[in-house]
UniProtKB/Swiss-Prot annotation:
Organism: Synechococcus sp. (strain CC9902)
Keywords carried by this UniProt record: Cytoplasm, Hydrolase, Nuclease, Ribosome biogenesis
UniProt GO MF annotations: nuclease activity
Protein name: Putative pre-16S rRNA nuclease
Enzyme class: hydrolase
Cellular localisation: Cytoplasm
Main location: cytoplasm
E.C. no: 3.1.-.-
GO cellular component terms given for this protein: cytosol
Family matches, as CDD domains: YqgF (cd16964)
GO biological process, any: rRNA 5'-end processing
Pfam families in alphabetical order: RuvX (PF03652)
Length: 164
């Protein structure tokens, strides 16, 4: 379920994540929020190993916030994977000391596959293309980044702003 009021975010360098069980699609934008670029997908390992790679991306790109996709169903309700994504996003944001925002990623992988001809891709290119779509969506619709601590108590059932 999407929130009624949307606050369009201030432009800043952001890292977008499409969190999956095997890979995390990654995309970033320039500090003005004009150019969105897919980045090489991260093949999942232990959280500490993921954190090293993601911290490096954040430092080299001067990232000021994270956007994490939440897979909601067609009715806007959280899926089982949404809770995994929420926990991962909060843990990552807290570890990096960055604010974050959630974006409804319903159909983002399908849309990315259609847009870029990547249906069935297993290399991670599709995951990162989906992360780029999430970031484009966030830049247009918000919501504003919030401290991870304010999201830590989330159950995955509360509404999120932005998204389609």
């Amino acid at each position: 379920m999407l929130g009624a009021s949307v606050t369009v975010p201030s432009a800043c360098s952001v890292l977008s994540l499409d969190v999956g069980r095997k890979r995390i699609g990654l995309a970033g934008c320039d500090p003005l929020g004009i150019t969105v670029s897919p980045l090489p997908a991260l093949h999942r390992g232990r959280f500490d190993n993921d954190l090293l790679v993601l911290r490096h991306h954040c430092q080299t790109r001067s990232v000021q916030g994270l956007v994490v996709g939440l897979p909601l169903d067609a009715a806007g309700q959280p899926t089982a994977q949404a809770e995994h994504c929420r926990r991962y996003g909060v843990r990552l944001a807290q570890s990096l000391g960055l604010p974050l925002a959630w974006v409804n990623e319903h159909s983002s992988t399908w849309a990315a596959g259609e847009r870029h001809g990547l249906q069935g891709d297993r290399t991670g290119r599709l995951d990162s293309a989906a992360a780029a779509l999430l970031l484009e969506q966030w830049l247009q619709d918000g919501p504003a980044l919030k401290p991870a601590q304010s999201m830590a108590a989330g159950t995955g059932a509360e509404p999120i702003d932005g998204g389609s």
